[in-house]
UniProtKB/Swiss-Prot annotation:
Domain SH3: 22-35
Protein name, as recorded: Sorbin and SH3 domain-containing protein 1
Organism for this UniProt entry: Rattus norvegicus (Rat)
PTM annotation, UniProt: O-glycosylated.
Domain SoHo: 1-8
A GO molecular-function annotation: protein kinase binding
Domain of life: Eukaryota
Function recorded in the entry: Plays a role in tyrosine phosphorylation of CBL by linking CBL to the insulin receptor. Required for insulin-stimulated glucose transport. Involved in formation of actin stress fibers and focal adhesions.
Gene that produces this protein: Sorbs1
Gene Ontology CC annotation, any one: flotillin complex
Length: 35
């Protein structure tokens, strides 16, 4: 992950409405984390 601040937002139960971290590989256009 590029930012430690966002590590909290990367929680499995947390879903993003805006997909701004597709570079991390967590968000793939669907704004949802599949890990």
């Amino acid at each position: 992950l590029n930012r430690d601040d966002d590590s909290d937002l990367h929680s499995p139960r947390y879903s993003f409405s805006e997909d701004t971290k597709c570079d991390d590989g967590w968000f793939v256009g669907t704004s949802r984390r599949t890990k």
